[in-house]
């Protein structure tokens, strides 16, 4: 494939992702108990005109939720890409390796502690707690990685760590007495509901700053994909680089878990879908495409979660698993055939 065809393919891929993002954005804004026309939605969003009830629903409920889905979905996908690069494993991801579950455990424990004392827990505190949990889980995974050189065993160990963290979290939440604490059960299953503009502001700042650093690391990531020896010859400090990948992926996944709980398979499935669409593994292209792809995938799954059995809302993690798990199965089968 010559350069012109490659460039055209990249433009087409990004155009497709952008179109799906816009379509799903509008669809999500309109989905719910109150249905509005496109013109009414545009008037409410851009001109701040329209029915007071519809205005409040869109501006105070739907828009914060949709923007949260876009930001967190993109962050989770990029986090998965970074972990796949770090472990050189196509099925590595925050959920599979138990990182999301570790973050969930620490956040849940801290939320229970604060709520039992009638103290509100700020967004920053939630992110810090989730980051600590992510790093603890990552520490266990890295210890296993040193002992076990088989990537399949590493993934299995990560899954076991995740199950342990989830079991402890569920145990604590189940036996909580306070009604507010019991409501943590919905968060522990994964949900984008209840997002506020304050939440959006905090997560946007954290994710944006992290993504800027990830973009600056595009060239070292590309060199690392070709092997540690090649990366060292290109002047990459492997030790610092690997620490950077761990920190960045943990920050992104921690931000997602803090606000939406653990969300499965997005970090694994989306990077592979994006690479298949682009037909390249170049980080400079894959990273922004992963962010867009994660946003599109999560918008679609959140739409399904909200509307299929309305007014009952499904766990977002259940929906992402339904659409993401087949991709993982396909990856494993294809890898087995290659071997």
List the model feature ranges, each with a label.
Residues 1-339:
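Alpha-helical transmembrane segments in inner-membrane proteins
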């Amino acid at each position: 494939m010559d350069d012109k065809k490659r460039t055209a393919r990249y433009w087409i891929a990004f155009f497709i992702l952008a179109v799906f993002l816009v379509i799903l954005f509008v669809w999500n804004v309109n989905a719910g108990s109150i249905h509005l026309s496109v013109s009414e939605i545009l008037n409410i969003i851009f001109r701040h005109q329209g029915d007071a009830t519809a205005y409040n629903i869109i501006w105070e409920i739907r828009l914060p939720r949709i923007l949260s889905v876009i930001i967190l979905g993109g962050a989770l996908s990029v986090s998965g890409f970074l972990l796949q690069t770090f472990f050189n494993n196509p099925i590595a991801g925050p959920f599979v390796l138990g990182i999301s579950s570790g973050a969930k455990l620490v956040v849940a424990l801290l939320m229970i502690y604060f709520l039992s004392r009638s103290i509100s827990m700020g967004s920053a505190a939630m992110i810090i707690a989730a980051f600590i949990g992510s790093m603890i889980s990552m520490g266990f995974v890295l210890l296993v990685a040193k002992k076990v050189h088989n990537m399949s065993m590493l993934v299995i160990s990560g899954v076991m760590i995740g199950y342990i963290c989830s079991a402890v979290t569920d145990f604590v939440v189940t036996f909580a007495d306070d009604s507010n604490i019991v409501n943590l059960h919905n968060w522990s299953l994964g949900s984008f509901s209840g997002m506020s503009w304050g939440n959006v502001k905090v997560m946007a700042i954290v994710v944006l700053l992290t993504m800027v650093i990830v973009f600056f690391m595009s060239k070292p990531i590309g060199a690392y994909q070709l092997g540690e020896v090649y990366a060292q010859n290109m002047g990459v400090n492997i030790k610092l680089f690997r620490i950077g990948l761990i920190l960045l992926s943990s920050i992104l996944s921690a931000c997602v878990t803090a606000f939406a709980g653990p969300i499965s398979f997005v970090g694994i499935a989306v990077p592979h879908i994006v690479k298949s669409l682009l037909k390249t593994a170049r980080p400079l292209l894959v990273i922004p495409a992963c962010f867009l792809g994660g946003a599109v995938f999560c918008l679609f799954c959140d739409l399904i979660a909200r509307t299929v059995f309305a007014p009952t809302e499904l766990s977002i993690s259940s929906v992402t698993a339904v659409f993401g798990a087949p991709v993982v199965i396909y990856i494993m089968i294809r890898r087995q055939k290659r071997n």
